[in-house]
């Protein structure tokens, strides 16, 4: 049996930190313009009304309003922001 670890096992003990992806604002939650709604890799969810998409596929609100999750079609989800007119 070896009494030293060997070079391979000591070099392999690293792990990268999690990327903090996922939904940041949930359905019927109030958001302001510019708030991030979803961080994702690829288009798991697509932008709907009043939602923009960044170059890393992050979805964010374009207006102040309430988040609404809905189905775009059978297997695609869509995120929209519905404006709230407070007695105007």
From Swiss-Prot:
GO terms for molecular function: structural constituent of ribosome. Residues 1-21 are annotated as: Disordered. GO terms for biological process: translation. InterPro entries: Ribosomal_bL27, Ribosomal_bL27_CS. SUPFAM superfamilies: Ribosomal L27 protein-like. Gene3D superfamilies: 2.40.50.100. One of its GO terms (cellular component) is cytosolic large ribosomal subunit. It holds the Pfam family Ribosomal_L27. Keywords: Ribonucleoprotein, Ribosomal protein. This is Large ribosomal subunit protein bL27. It comes from Helicobacter pylori (strain G27).
